[in-house]
From Swiss-Prot:
Entry GO CC: plasma membrane
Organism of derivation: Pan troglodytes (Chimpanzee)
GO biological-process terms attached to the record: cell adhesion; homophilic cell adhesion via plasma membrane adhesion molecules; nervous system development
Domain (Cadherin): residue spans on this chain: 29-133, 134-242, 243-347, 348-452, 453-562, 570-682
The name this protein goes by in its record: Protocadherin gamma-A2
Ranges per topology, Cytoplasmic: 714-932
Biased composition (Polar residues): 806-841
Compartments, as annotated in UniProt: Cell membrane
UniProt keyword terms in alphabetical order: Calcium, Cell adhesion, Cell membrane, Glycoprotein, Membrane, Repeat, Signal, Transmembrane, Transmembrane helix
Domain of life: Eukaryota
Glycosylated residue positions: 419, 545, 685
Length: 932
């Protein structure tokens, strides 16, 4: 029961809460104030902060401002107090004319929350305008026959104020004939009429002067006057009459100027002059008389100025018809202006930003704007849009407000700015549209690392380059901007041949240009691997790297090195033997040389620069083989001197020379015998012949004795040096190790065949002594057709030296051994012409050099398996003549051992053309000359 009694109270409380919520919502939705016109600037209007329920400080922090449209700013906000004050002079008549009440609407924007509040301010009228007549003096003509009670409409006055301050009454100065009657129209205006109270007598008084006063109801009262001059005429007792008291017409606002819109007609019952009617527009304040024109004779109403629905929706025109004597009547024309779609929508940008970060989240607000169309109805209905391919969208708010927001993440590297075109379109037919442009810059963040144009780089630099020379330039591009795109360059520190990489090259951190800090030597360093780093200046910085390969190109900076003949260090000259029975093409010796360079710079050619007997010898262009060019004659000198030049093919070419001494004889005793037979023939009747012979023999004996002593000393020195070489493994002293594989082996191999010549006291006998080689077996001469024995020596000594030598020799390099299929044939079977073919490229050249030197090394240690014939090193006919060594052991067949019938043989003990056991089976026919 108690619950039932409390139910009505709960229902009342609920209704009260609902009413309060409704009032609060209405209050929150719109704020209304009232202020008088013409108050001072800065006058208080209302407390916005209080009415919004905010503190003034909070209101200032949220960024509050007034958003108005289409007219000057009349109000302002005081951010400290939160008060709304007047900003300019307010004239109600200018703003609202005769409209009452006069309401001004504007919006208040809280920028922090982008919240809009509507504010309505009523402008109350003050009595600041006095009534005014359209004409200051009015002339009336009245016939003397006019009966009392006749009414004459007068010009009415206009007061711009409204309410009590508007026109309230008319008054006429006291007189005997006229009175004033004021009638109220349907529109609320007051129209004065002059009433004839007593008949007129023109002869008594022809003109009457009256004063009409119009007063308002303000405090103080304001008034205006108009003077009326009444002339008394003869009888004209009928005034013109319009066909209808009020005319109504509707025309579109785009009606052209000069168009006739209406023709009014008034008739007068009088005749003659009294019936002649003319038409006039009543002069009144405003623009009506400036827009329309009424032709006085025809009554045609035409347009003389463009109409604008947005300025005035209708026009009320007062027209007059007056006859000849001056009687007139009035009518009204109401012109309604029809709206046409002649106004495009307008943009009012409320808030907009000019820049947005590229990492802004979708939904970021870019700007707030309003769209308004001055037309009405469907012509004022607006829609707003933007292109579909942009990462933005429009969100509509209240009162045609729109928010521009992002729809997805932005990327400055794709689009650094957006020229956003907003299009507002109305609902007219045809529709009108307006475009607004917003230039939005996308602020950069460091989201891109520098990128190189290639994944790796390679460059070539010639050796012996100057220090500080520019080697290469790398460039990385960063699509970011400003500091995020500023790229600096460096490289990863590394160690090259025990030295830091920074001691070889440097890099300009700004330009990416690499410089050489030292002069490179191809023979020591052939390439460098560098990791270049490109780093931007963002926060945090981003970087990328790229591989750079620097290849050192070979230059011709090393002259050829002559390996054979290697002359003794005491300055003596070796002697080569050429038998007089040698046929053209006989191999005398071979010049062996190498070049520390590579490629074309290491291609060698041999030339005969000088010869004591031109045309007797020739040198192979590519092989260096010295051969007889023709058969030896008896007139050819015993001693022939040859100068051979070895030249590479670099630019410019480098060369080296060697001087060879060739003794033309079958054996050394033959040389001595020939030298001994060179005695001057006896002349008859020469008395001093005996004396000359004695002196000559003595001189020759002394010279020969000195020569024998020198050769003996030389022999002892070479024997001692040979022992030293055997103790040191047969390596050459005083020569730098070559970078070519097997050069040291070639030197050891050639050292094996160094020989000495010594002469005994018997000038017709000689000894050719070979130092013990580093190994027991020697290469078998391909040109030799006889197999000779070693020099007589204790067998135990030879075996001991073999064991010592083999213990010092390195095992053969199996990498350079060729299979049977890879042995195209011996080069020893090729003729040593000068038309050899050069290798096609640097790879072939280096491979050839490596094979030559490795083959020479294997020949030195007695384990060569190149095959293809003795001394040919298994090379093909194409490359065989370049470095053949088969001629080296051939010289032993020309050696005669004094006091013995033995001759030199190969290591296997072969003599007299007999092949040893286990030989290669290649036998020469006896009795034939040695030929290649």
């Amino acid at each position: 029961m108690a619950a039932l009694q409390k139910l009505p109270h709960c229902r009342k409380l609920f209704l009260l809460c609902f009413l309060l919520a409704t009032l609060w919502e209405a209050r929150a939705g719109q704020i209304r104030y009232s202020v008088r016109e013409e108050i001072d600037r800065g006058s208080f209007v209302g407390n916005i902060a209080k009415d919004l329920g905010l503190e003034p400080l909070a209101l200032a922090e949220q960024g509050v401002r007034i958003v108005s449209r289409g007219r000057s700013q009349l109000f302002a906000l005081n951010p400290r107090s939160g008060s709304l004050v007047t900003a300019n002079r307010i004239d109600r008549e200018e703003l609202c004319a005769q409209s009452a009440p006069c309401l001004l609407n504007f919006n208040i924007l809280l920028e922090d929350k982008l919240t809009i509040y509507s504010v309505e301010v009523e402008i109350t009228d003050i009595n600041d305008n006095a009534p005014r007549f359209g004409v200051e003096e009015l002339e009336l003509k009245i016939s003397e026959t006019t009966t009392p009670g006749f009414r004459i409409p007068l010009k009415n006055a206009h007061d711009a104020d409204v309410g009590e301050n508007a026109l309230q009454k008319y008054a006429l100065n006291p007189n005997d004939h006229f009175s004033l009657d004021v009638r109220s129209g349907a529109d609320g205006n007051k129209y004065p009429e002059l009433v004839l109270e007593r008949a007129l007598d023109r002869e008594e008084e022809a003109v009457h002067h009256l004063v009409l006063v119009a007063s308002d109801g303000g405090d103080p009262v304001l008034s205006g006057t108009s003077r009326i001059c009444v002339k008394v005429l003869d009888a004209n007792d009928n005034a013109p009459v319009f066909t209808q008291p009020e005319y109504r017409i509707s025309i579109p606002e785009n009606t052209p100027v000069g168009t006739r819109i209406l023709t009014v007609t008034a008739t007068d019952a009088d005749e003659g002059y009294y019936a002649q009617v003319v038409y006039f527009l009543e002069k009144s304040p405003g623009e009506t008389s400036e827009v329309f024109e009424l032709k006085s004779t025809s009554g045609e109403l035409t347009i003389i100025k463009d109409l604008d629905y947005e300025d005035a929706t209708f026009h009320e025109i007062d027209i007059e018809a007056q006859d000849g004597p001056g009687l007139l009547t009035r009518a009204k024309v109401i012109v309604t202006v029809l709206d046409v779609n002649d106004n495009a929508p307008e943009f009012y940008m409320t808030s907009a930003t000019s820049s947005v970060s590229e990492d802004s989240l979708p939904g970021t607000i870019i700007g707030l704007f309003n769209v308004h169309d001055r037309d009405s109805g469907q012509n004022a209905f607006t829609t707003c849009s933007l292109p579909e391919n942009l990462p933005f969208k429009l969100e509509k708010s209240v009162d045609n407000y729109y928010r521009l927001v992002t729809t997805r993440a932005l990327d400055r590297e794709q689009f650094s700015f957006y020229n956003i075109t907003l299009t507002a379109k109305d609902g007219g037919n045809p529709s009108l549209s307006t475009d607004a442009h917003i230039l939005l810059q996308v602020a950069d963040i460091n989201d891109n690392a520098p990128a190189f144009s290639r994944t790796s780089y390679s460059t070539y630099i010639p050796e012996n380059n100057p220090r500080g020379a520019s080697v290469f330039s790398v460039t990385a591009h960063d699509p970011d901007s400003n500091d995020n795109a500023h790229v600096t360059y460096s490289f990863v520190e590394d160690t090259v041949q025990g030295a830091p990489l920074s001691s070889y090259i440097s890099i300009n951190s700004d330009t990416g240009v690499l410089y050489a800090l030292r002069s490179f030597d191809y023979e020591q360093l052939r390439d460098l691997q560098v990791w270049v780093i490109a780093r931007d200046s963002g926060n945090p910085p981003l970087s990328s790297n790229v591989s750079l390969s620097l290849f050192v190109l070979d230059q011709n900076d090393n002259p050829p090195e002559i390996l054979y003949p290697a002359f003794p260090t005491d300055g003596s000259t070796g002697v080569e033997l050429a038998p007089r029975s040698a046929e053209p093409g006989y191999l005398v010796t071979k010049v062996v040389a190498v070049d520390r360079d590579s490629g074309q710079n290491a291609w060698l050619s041999y030339h005969l620069l000088k010869a004591s007997e031109p045309g007797l010898f020739s040198v192979g262009l590519h092989t260096g083989e010295v051969r007889t060019a023709r058969a030896l004659l008896d007139r050819d000198a015993l001693k022939q001197s040859l100068v051979v030049a070895v030249q590479d093919h670099g630019q410019p070419p480098l060369s080296a020379t060697v001087t060879l001494t060739v003794a033309v004889a079958d054996r050394i005793p033959d040389i001595l015998a020939d030298l001994g037979s060179l005695e001057p023939s006896a002349k008859p009747n020469d008395s001093d012949l005996t004396l000359y012979l004695v002196v000559a023999v003595a001189a020759v004996s002394c010279v020969f004795l000195a020569f024998v002593i020198v050769l003996l000393a030389h022999r002892l020195r070479r024997w001692h040096k040979s022992r030293l070489l055997q103790a040191s493994g047969g390596s050459l002293t005083g020569m730098q190790s070559s970078h070519f594989v097997g050069v040291d082996g070639v030197r050891a191999f050639l050292q094996t065949y160094s020989h000495e010549v010594s002469l005994t006291a018997d000038s017709r006998k000689s000894h050719l002594i070979f130092p013990q080689p580093n190994y027991a077996d020697t290469l078998i001469s391909q040109e030799s057709c006889e197999k000779k024995d070693f020099l007589s020596a204790p067998q135990s000594l030879l075996e001991e030296e073999r064991e010592e030598t083999f213990s010092q020799q390195a095992p053969p390099n199996t990498d350079w051994r060729f299979s049977q299929a890879q042995r195209p044939g011996t080069s020893g079977s090729q003729n040593g012409d000068d038309t050899g073919t050069w290798p096609n490229n640097q790879f072939d050249t280096e491979m050839l050099q490596a094979m030559i030197l490795a083959s020479a090394s294997e020949a030195a240690d007695g384990s060569s398996t190149l095959g293809g014939g003795a001394g040919t090193m298994g090379l093909s006919a194409r490359y065989g003549p370049q470095f053949t060594l088969q001629h080296v052991p051939d010289y032993r067949q020309n050696v005669y051992i004094p006091g013995s019938n033995a001759t030199l043989t190969n290591a296997a003990g072969k003599r007299d053309g007999k092949a040893p056991a286990g030989g290669n089976g290649n036998k020469k026919k006896s009795g034939k000359k040695e030929k290649k």
